[in-house]
Regions:
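Conserved short alpha-helical segments that host acidic/polar catalytic motifs at enzyme active sites
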Residues: 1-250, 262-295, 334, 429, ...
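Hydrophobic alpha-helical scaffolding
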Residues: 7-10, 100, 120, 135-139, ...
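Glycine-rich oxoanion-binding loops at beta->alpha junctions
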Residues: 67, 71-84, 275-288, 312-348, ...
Length: 610
């Protein structure tokens, strides 16, 4: 993984591929490369470790001319980041070039088989096996060779391939990894993600698992593995191409933090009736009997989406009174879970392509569970695999660290909890009306937080040099603390941990010492007294406490060194507000430390391998 592009047409392929790869930089990567079928049908490969600019310099110094090519940005899974491990990979005879997202799980026995035949490998990757297999199995027909090669490999993949003997054709296929074909006039495009091609075309085919695509300048043919034609509707992309630009902000992350009021408004749009008395989820169309038949809810996700799931557990159990279990997706499928037909499995994924989450979804469905996907990407794997889907209308999120996707996930999940409660009759009508009214005000309330950004920036500048930080909270605040901790560590590289306030005495207090920053969330009235005791405990050890509470909380201000107040609202809506200053605090701490905010080290935006 991470990003794939391909071009065939009348332009110089290298120009498009460098442009497209730049649009995929948000995924995170450690190297980049291109392969172009040029003069005399020779495949010329150029690849370089590091930023895309390194590859661009190589291409500028040694132009790569031709009208058909494939490109890739890599995030290492097999083999260290290096020039030789970068994609594309070629066969020894130079006939084939391949780019690949995913993992070839049986690459080692295949490699041993090829080594025994005298094939020489030049990289440590699993992908190179595919190039050599194509060469070893070549029967003079590119397409039939690809189909037979696919019978040999196991795992997850998006594969895009060219053959020097058939220089007017690109062949691509996928399994459990995203792939899209863009349609032009006298030219066509291939990419792992729509942003790579949106400036060239809005007419696309979203490729499904086990489909094989044959692309020429004037045609796109889609078949199944056996070669039978597949009929597919054209998907028209409605995104604004400018949505992927920074819009005057220094970083995508800051831009996306400030886009949250609009993203929240868009996610709420049409989902609350005029009187704020009902949630309207037309895309679900569930019945009271169906919801009453749900005995248990399983939420599974990874990273930030997992933290959204933890908040949702409180939402659903309190408002709909249905038991909820939250699982890390990578753990769920390996523990023989107790999932059955009375279970509703909710999977959360910004991209809709997260490999572990997709695997968990498939396992839950295999065990008989009903399934619901919550994702930000129309046509994504989650949206296709789940029985039903709720979209968060956050728009493209470019920065690796998720911000607006998280807050819109919380909005969608709070609406879902209310929706479940109104269908099974377990939600209090007054509570429902209060929540829905406050949700309608949420975009404006989020804007208010930005009025205090200078104060947050000052805290970050003052404490950004610290190497450790702790986050505390109780109930929903604990789940938000976990997200705040993740944001701080992933972009500023400050070691940060989140703890439930009641766990302090069970070990954490041993780590509290003079001058260590503690961010204490105190928005939940039901545990106020306990949380104040926890704050006093860390203050007694000379910690520097930044309290996060709602406006007018004079008691909190007495016990902490600094306060960050968010607008006053109800206990269910406030987590969506409380996370915003934590995002800003993390952002400015990273700036203070000179970190690469949009592309933190060792991380990828969309994790499409297990």
């Amino acid at each position: 993984m991470c990003g794939i592009v391909g071009y065939i047409g009348f332009e110089n392929a290298a120009d498009f591929m460098l442009e497209g790869l730049e649009k995929l930089e948000y995924h995170g990567y450690d190297s980049a490369g291109i392969a172009v079928v040029g003069e005399n049908n020779v495949i010329k490969v150029q690849k370089k470790m590091g930023r895309l600019a390194n590859l661009e310099a190589v291409v500028k110094a040694d132009p790569n001319q031709g009208h058909i090519g494939i490109g890739h940005t890599r995030w290492a899974t097999h083999g260290r980041p290096s020039d030789m491990n970068a994609h594309p990979h070629t066969s020894t005879d130079g006939k084939f070039a391949v780019v690949h997202n995913g993992i070839i799980e049986n690459y080692m026995p295949l490699k041993e088989e090829l080594l025994a035949k005298g094939v020489e490998f030049t990289s440590e990757t699993d992908t190179e096996v595919v190039a050599h297999l194509l060469s070893d199995m070549y029967d003079g027909n590119f397409e039939s060779t690809v189909r037979r090669m696919l019978e040999r490999i196991e795992g997850s993949y998006s594969l895009v391939m060219v053959c020097a003997d058939e220089p007017n054709k690109i062949i691509a296929t996928k399994k459990d990894n995203p792939l899209v074909v863009g349609l032009g006039k006298g030219e066509n495009f291939i990419a792992s993600d729509i942003p790579a091609i949106i400036q060239r075309t809005r007419e696309t085919y979203i490729i499904n698992d086990n489909e094989v695509v044959i692309v020429t300048p004037d045609s796109v043919t889609i078949t199944d593995r056996a070669g039978q034609p597949v009929q597919k509707d054209i998907y028209h992309v409605t995104w604004n191409a400018e949505a992927a630009e920074k819009g005057g902000y220094e970083h995508f992350m800051l831009k996306e933090i400030y886009e949250q009021p609009k993203a929240i408004r868009d996610t709420l749009s049409g989902r609350i009736n005029k009187d704020a008395t009902e949630v309207v989820y037309d895309e679900l169309n569930w019945t009271p009997d169906m919801v009453k038949g749900i005995k248990r809810i399983l939420i599974t996700a990874c990273g930030t989406a997992y933290h959204a799931g933890l908040v949702a557990k409180y939402y659903i159990e309190q408002l709909a009174r249905i038991p909820v279990e939250v699982d890390i997706a990578s753990e769920y499928r390996y523990r023989t879970p107790l999932t059955d037909e009375d279970t509703l499995c909710i999977v959360i994924s910004q991209s809709g392509e997260t490999s572990d989450t997709l695997s968990a979804l498939k396992e839950a469905k295999r065990l008989g569970a009903k399934s619901l996907g919550i994702t930000n990407v129309v046509g994504s794997a989650v949206s296709r695999e789940a029985d039903q889907v709720i979209y968060t209308w956050a728009g493209p999120e470019i920065a690796v660290a998720s911000t607006k996707a998280y807050t819109t996930q919380l909005v969608a999940l709070l609406l879902l909890a209310v929706y479940l409660g109104q269908l099974n009759g377990r939600i209090d009508e007054a509570v429902k009306h209060e929540i829905l009214t406050n949700l309608q005000e949420l975009p404006a309330l989020t804007h208010e937080i930005f009025e205090n950004v200078d104060e947050i920036k000052a805290f970050a500048n003052h404490y950004g040099y610290k190497e450790d930080a702790f986050f505390l909270g109780r109930l929903i605040d604990y789940a938000v603390a976990m997200e705040g901790s993740l944001k701080l560590k992933e972009i500023s590289y400050i070691h940060a941990e989140a703890y439930a306030g009641g766990e302090l005495k069970h070990g954490t207090l041993a780590l509290i010492e003079e001058g260590i920053p503690v961010i204490a969330l105190a928005t939940q009235e039901s545990v106020r007294e306990k949380m104040m005791s926890n704050i006093k405990e860390v203050k007694a050890r000379d910690a520097i406490v930044i309290g996060v509470g709602m406006k007018g909380d004079e008691e909190l201000a007495k016990y902490v060194d600094h306060t960050i107040f968010v607008p006053k609202t109800d206990a269910f809506t406030v987590p969506i507000l409380a996370v915003v200053p934590l995002q800003l605090l993390s952002y400015y701490a990273a700036i203070t430390r000179g970190a690469d905010v949009d592309k933190p080290r060792n991380l990828a935006k969309s994790v499409t391998v297990e």
